[in-house]
């Protein structure tokens, strides 16, 4: 019983978090009208200008694509701390997804298959 309660709370937290991000995107537009909903959703689904996972996002850190549930985050690091070359001193950023979010996403996909089938 405890496991079911914990799983239910986890699922509700994830679902509310993903829907809250979508609502925040809607609220950012100052002139939001009902006619603007369809073009907004089309832009979010297509979004060809986003940076794919594990690709360079150094120049535009807010351009990472969105997976099915969560948005990827631009994480920066230095390639090598040992050498004094110019390349080692340059910061490198790539779009990545946290491992716990990846596991949650895969788990929910498997749960959907289990419930549906």
UniProtKB/Swiss-Prot annotation:
**Tissue/organ expression:** Expressed by the venom gland.
Disulphide bond pairs: 50-65, 57-74, 64-95, 76-93
A single Gene Ontology CC annotation of this entry is: membrane
- Lineage: superkingdom: Eukaryota
Q: Does the keyword Membrane apply?
A: yes
Arranged from A to Z, the UniProt key words for this protein are: Amidation, Cytolysis, Disulfide bond, Knottin, Membrane, Neurotoxin, Secreted, Signal, Target cell membrane, Target membrane, Toxin
Q: Which family does it belong to?
A: Belongs to the neurotoxin 19 (CSTX) family. 12 subfamily.
Tell me, how does this one assemble?
Heterodimer of A and B chains; disulfide-linked. Interacts with CSTX-1 (AC P81694), and with CSTX-9 (AC P58604).
Q: What is known of its domains?
A: The presence of a 'disulfide through disulfide knot' structurally defines this protein as a knottin.
Q: What does this protein do?
A: Synergistic toxin that induces or increases a cytolytic effect when combined with CSTX-1 (AC P81694) or CSTX-9 (AC P58604). When alone, has a weak insecticidal activity, with an unknown molecular target.
Q: This protein is called what?
A: Toxin CSTX-12
According to its UniProt entry, this protein's organism is Cupiennius salei (American wandering spider)
């Amino acid at each position: 019983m405890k496991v079911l309660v914990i799983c239910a709370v986890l699922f509700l937290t994830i679902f509310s978090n993903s829907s809250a991000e979508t609502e925040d995107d809607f609220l950012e537009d100052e002139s939001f009208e009902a006619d603007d909903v369809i073009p907004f959703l089309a832009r979010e689904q297509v979004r060809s200008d986003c940076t794919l996972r594990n690709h360079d996002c150094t120049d535009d850190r807010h351009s990472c694509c969105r997976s099915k549930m969560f948005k990827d985050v631009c994480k920066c690091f230095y390639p090598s701390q040992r050498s004094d070359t110019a390349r080692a001193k340059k910061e490198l950023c790539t779009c990545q997804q946290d491992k716990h979010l990846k596991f949650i996403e895969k788990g929910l996909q498997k749960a959907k298959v289990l419930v549906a089938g």
